[in-house]
C-alpha cells in the first residue's frame, strides 16, 4: 500500500502514511494480527484531538470513522452506549430533543467520543463537572494483540484507558452517563475585562450566581490581560423542541 499525505485538522501539519479503513471490529483485529512487523500504528476518527497525535509519518493510520453508531439509550438509568467514532455534534442532536445532555464536552463539535476519552477533554463546566472521563461508566476496548474485552469503572485497567491517547487500548465503544435537561437553549452573559484581576473577579462572581459554564478569551498582546468573558446557564423557559449544534 502506497503512502498518502494526510493533514491535521487545522491543515498546518502533515505526514505520509498508509491509511486503512476497517468496517468491523474483526477487521481492526486482523490489521493488528497480520501486521506484527509494523513498528507503529495510530488511530484516528475526526482527527481533531489536541497535539495531532494521530500523525504517523511513514507508519500506518487506522481510520475509525466507520464506527459512528449510537447503540443504546437507557432513559431510566440515564446512560447511552456509542461507538468511538460518534461525533459530539451527532450525540447532542440525538440526546437533546429527548431531554438529555452530556457534561464536560469540548467546544469543537466535530470531536468524537473516542477522541474525547483518549484526550480526556474538558468543557466550559470543568470547574464543576471535571473532565470527559467522568462521564465514562464502561468501555469496550481492543489491545495490541487484537483481543476485545470490556472494562468497567473501578477496574484496574479502566484509568489507563482514559487520557492515554490510545497507548494502552483502542477504544471501540463507551457507555456514558448522561443528565436530564429541561431546555435546549442557554442564557449567555458576555462581558469585556481590562485586566487579569477583573477576569478573576468575574469568575468568582458568576460561580456564586450558579452559572455552570464559564470561559474567557484573552488578548495576549496586551500585558494587562484584556479580553472577553462568557458565562452561561440553561434557559429553563425555552419551549424549543429541537436545536442543531
Where are these regions (language model features)?
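Glycine-rich N-terminal segment of FAD-binding domains in flavoprotein oxidoreductases
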Residues: 10-104, 120-125
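Short, glycine/charge-rich beta-strand/loop segments that flank catalytic centers
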Residues: 46-49, 104-117, 218-220
Amino acid at each position: 500500500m502506497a503512502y498518502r499525505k494526510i493533514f491535521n485538522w487545522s491543515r498546518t501539519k502533515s505526514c505520509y502514511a498508509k491509511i486503512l479503513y476497517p468496517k468491523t471490529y474483526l477487521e481492526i483485529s486482523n490489521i493488528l494480527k497480520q501486521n506484527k512487523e509494523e513498528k507503529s500504528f495510530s488511530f484516528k476518527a475526526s482527527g481533531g484531538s489536541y497535539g495531532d497525535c494521530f500523525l504517523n509519518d511513514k507508519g500506518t493510520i487506522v481510520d475509525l470513522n466507520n464506527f459512528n453508531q449510537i447503540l443504546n439509550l437507557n432513559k431510566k438509568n440515564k446512560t447511552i452506549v456509542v461507538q468511538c467514532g460518534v461525533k459530539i455534534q451527532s450525540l447532542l442532536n440525538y440526546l437533546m430533543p429527548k431531554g438529555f445532555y452530556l457534561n464536560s464536552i469540548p467546544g469543537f463539535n466535530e470531536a468524537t467520543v473516542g477522541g474525547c476519552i483518549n484526550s480526556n477533554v474538558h468543557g466550559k463546566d470543568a470547574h464543576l463537572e471535571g473532565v470527559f472521563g467522568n462521564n465514562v461508566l464502561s468501555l469496550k476496548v481492543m489491545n495490541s494483540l487484537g483481543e476485545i474485552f470490556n472494562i468497567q469503572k473501578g477496574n484496574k485497567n479502566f484509568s489507563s484507558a482514559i487520557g492515554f491517547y490510545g497507548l494502552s487500548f483502542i477504544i471501540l465503544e463507551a457507555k456514558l452517563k448522561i443528565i436530564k435537561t429541561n431546555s435546549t437553549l442557554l442564557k449567555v452573559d458576555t462581558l469585556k475585562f481590562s485586566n487579569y484581576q477583573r477576569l478573576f473577579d468575574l469568575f468568582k462572581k458568576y460561580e456564586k450566581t450558579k452559572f455552570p459554564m464559564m470561559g474567557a478569551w484573552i488578548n495576549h498582546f496586551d500585558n494587562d490581560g484584556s479580553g472577553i468573558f462568557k458565562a452561561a446557564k440553561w434557559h429553563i423557559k425555552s419551549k424549543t423542541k429541537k436545536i442543531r449544534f
